[in-house]
Amino acid sequence: MKLIFCLDKNNGMLFAGKRQSRDSILYEELLKRIGECKLWISSYSASLFPQMSNIIIDDDYCSKATENEYCFIENKGYEIDNCKSVIIYKWNRLYPSDTSFNIDLKKNGFKLTLKRDFVGNSHEKITEEIYERV
């Protein structure tokens, strides 16, 4: 499977169980990136995405997604062992956080294959990083 995260400058993900931020352009870019592939999301994330046939809302997505399908991770657990790529969208800001992404991707066999910046709706810079398992 392929995991997708949104992180702040310190790899923060959540604060008090809530997402740190959101940006409509980021979600448009994410949907362009995945194309027609399936995107698994939790019920918590459902309000961020339009209703589309390739978006599946299921709180047990990590156990159901197959090798070439995507999982958007916000407030649920995940397994990096079965993952073949990781996409990280980084906000250009620091937000309060009490849940962070603390996995060393390089130590877990991933290599950065793409890094690009784009302008968001409410963020002057969002960085997309794609890591592939080598």
Task: Name each model-derived stretch.
Residues 1-134:
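Enzymes that bind and transform nitrogen-containing heteroaromatic metabolites
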